[in-house]
Regions:
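Outer-membrane beta-barrel domain signature
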Residues: 70-78
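Short S/T/G/P-rich N-terminal loop/turn motif that feeds into the first structured element of a domain
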Residues: 1-49, 56-68, 80-98
């Protein structure tokens, strides 16, 4: 399993409805990408969120960035950001869940 961690810094306080819309509008497309495992949005400051996306392989994460990141995120999120997202990707080397 691999994960990508995107740190997004916004110009203004984050509007949570933006990510509620992302859930509604992108869930089907995310699930359609082979290897997709999950998507989480964590608000870490008033003007900052961290996206954590899990997939079987890095290639699925790259595909998500190309197919969803460059379109929906580019149109709906990028104009609100205070700079380019910080993106890190790598293998998951430990995990515990319920």
């Amino acid at each position: 399993m691999h994960a990508v961690i995107n740190t997004l810094r916004f110009k203004e306080p984050v509007d949570p409805t933006l990510f509620e819309r992302a859930e509604r509008e992108l869930a089907g497309q995310m699930r359609a990408i082979e290897g997709f495992q999950g998507f989480r949005v964590v608000q870490v400051a008033d003007d900052q969120v961290v996206l954590v996306i899990f997939a079987d392989a890095a290639e699925a994460l790259d595909r998500m960035a190309t197919e969803l990141g460059n379109t929906w995120m580019g149109a709906n999120v990028a104009p609100l950001l205070d700079g380019a997202p910080e993106r890190r990707i790598g293998p998951v080397i430990g995990s515990v869940s319920v």
